Regions:
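Acidic, metal-coordinating helix/loop segments flanking the phosphotransfer/catalytic sites
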Residues: 5, 29-46, 54
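Conserved acidic carboxylate
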Residues: 8
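Two-component/phosphorelay signaling modules centered on CheY-like receiver
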Residues: 11-29
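Conserved phosphotransfer cores of two-component systems
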Residues: 41-43, 64-70, 81
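Conserved phosphotransfer microenvironments
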Residues: 50-65
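Hydrophobic/aromatic residues positioned on beta-strands within the core alpha/beta folds
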Residues: 74-76
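C-terminal output helix
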Residues: 94-107
């Protein structure tokens, strides 16, 4: 079972994504900010994250810190810098099925 890290500062959204991904068969870790994410990303196949997360480290800095070492899927409701080293950008609101398919695709790439 692949381990996924979900990074989201909105507690309701975080819990909803955790439940959806667990129901889809993933082992899910969560983080409310970049600092927690930096402590928890190792061992994960994919990081699913909101780009706008609170300081001390914002989403772009988190991406720079982990890019190339784990697959990164960004969920964004706005404009995303085109040069961010992420694997995929999904627009919010993102249907659960699309998120699950995206995660499965990136896990398959790693195998």
């Amino acid at each position: 079972m692949a381990r996924i890290l979900v990074v989201e500062d909105d507690a309701t959204q975080l819990e909803m994504r955790r439940q959806i991904l667990q129901h889809a068969g993933f082992d899910v870790a969560t983080a409310r900010d970049a600092q927690e994410a930096l402590e928890r990303w190792k061992g994960c196949a994919v990081v699913v994250m909101d780009l706008r997360i609170p300081e001390p480290e914002d989403g772009a800095r988190l991406i720079q810190a982990i890019a190339g070492r784990v697959r990164i899927i960004v969920l964004s409701g706005g404009q995303v810098e085109p040069d961010l080293p992420v694997d995929e950008i999904l627009t919010k609101p993102c249907p659960s099925r699309r998120l699950i398919e995206s995660i499965q695709r990136w896990i398959h790439v790693e195998e």
